[in-house]
Structure formats: C-alpha cells, structure tokens
Amino acid sequence: MSAFTRRTLLTASAGAAALALSSCGLAGGKDEGPTEKDGVTTIVVGASPKPHAEILQFVQDELAQEAGLSLKITQYTDYQIPNQALNDGDLDANFYQTPNFLEQQEKEKGYEFHGFEGIHVEPMGLYSDSLASLDEVPDGAKAAIANDPANTGRGLALFEAAGLITLKEGVDVISATPADIAENPKNIEFTTLEAAQIARSLGDVDLGAVNGNYALEAGKSPKDDSLFLEPGEDSPYGNMLVVREADKDNEALVKLNELLHSDEVKAFIEETYSDGSVIPAF
C-alpha cells in the first residue's frame, strides 16, 4: 500500500471551520487510502464535532490500537466540505451523514461513495427561544429549516409529524420543499438556512428544525429542550461511516466500521448520551 506524502486541510468557507483534533499533520496523499507503517494503519476521518468526533475519539482511545489502527480525526462544522474532502482524497472516510443526505449529494455532485450500516441516530427536533409549546405557535410564525435538500425534506416531514403542516400526497420527502406543502393552517413562513446556523438563529424565528448534533453543539438537550422530537426507533436517518466506492472493501476501513458497531461503542453512546439525544442504530 503506497504511503501518502501529504494531507491538506480544506479551508472552510462561509463561516465553516475545520479543526484538526490531532496536533500532528495529516498523513497521506490523494486518493490512495489509509497509510500503513510499522503494522499500524492510519485513517484520516472527517467528522462533525458532536457526537461523531467524540465517538471516533473513544474508538481511538479504547479500541484502535488493539485493532492495528490509528485515527486522525478532523472536525467540520459544515455539511458540504467533508464529502468534498473525501472525494478529493483529503480524507479516507467521513462520519457525519445520513443515507438520505448521501443519496442527495451523490445525485447533485456525482460522488461515488459507499455508506456502511447506520451507527447512531440523532433525532431532529423543533426548537424555539420564544415558545414553550407547539400550542403557542402563532399565525404567520416564522420557521427555519435546513437549506440542503435532504434536510429540507426531513425538516418539513418533522413539521408534518408535529401536526403543523401537511405535505402533498405522494411527495418524496427526500426532495420535498415548501412548495410541496398542501395544508398550512398556521400560515407558517419557512426560511432556509445552513443547517449549522439554525440553532444560533432561533432568536430571529419562532421555531426551527435543528439536527441533533447541532442542538448538542448549541448546548441544548433534544429530550428536554425540544418542542417536538423526531422518533428514534426504526429511523431511516442512521449516521454512518462513508468511504469512496473504490475503498469499500479496504481492510482497515472495514475494520473501523466494525469497531463503530462494537458493543463497546454501543455502551459508550448509551452512557454518554443518556438523555436520548444520540441513540445506537444497531
């Protein structure tokens, strides 16, 4: 297996920042996969800070060495850059996305990726800085949903599940937009924002659909602070490890995925996120 010669951290744009958890430079080079040296394979993984990077750090601290792996974890607060970095060869894998988001990205960007089985679910919730319950939603309320297509549809499905809107019959949730709303008795005005910005923008709207990881980063408890929480059981939104299609059988990456589905990781998730904000998907 060829050794990588360098790694380049992407400079995040539009306020998105990438922060390396390791003080060492990233090992490796473009498109060649994990690097092996002295019997240890280094894998560079991009992840959202919470809970993805925390779960990966647990694997690095407790499980990786015995498995002959070393993880270099790079944090991203943006939903677009980690897939770009994986496609460009700056990452060997990323861990932050759901199947519907991956499907949408592959359609839009032409990526050829492989998603392993779901590891955990972060229930999306409706949050507000001004309302104590959904009963208080005013006529003409301003609401924020994510502007990436997969999470736009997921957010609208959440508003529908909460009884605030009804989507047109037969609409594909993965591509749903506000134009697909059939009934809107509260005349809610929807605006779209970067997913990472919604939790920080709740003061500007009446309520917003916030992804679980961004709720955690904003110091909110999905179980205690949300007005309505997406059901976690049998969720199609399991977060998964994603690699390039050509690397799906790479021994080190397959091994990492196995570690992420281990009993130890399941126990870590259940104990660390006991408020139900992160739920094992296996």
What are these regions (language model features)?
Residues 6-10:
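N-terminal export leaders
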Residues 123-134, 237-250:
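A bilobed periplasmic-binding-protein/Venus flytrap-type ligand-binding module shared by bacterial periplasmic
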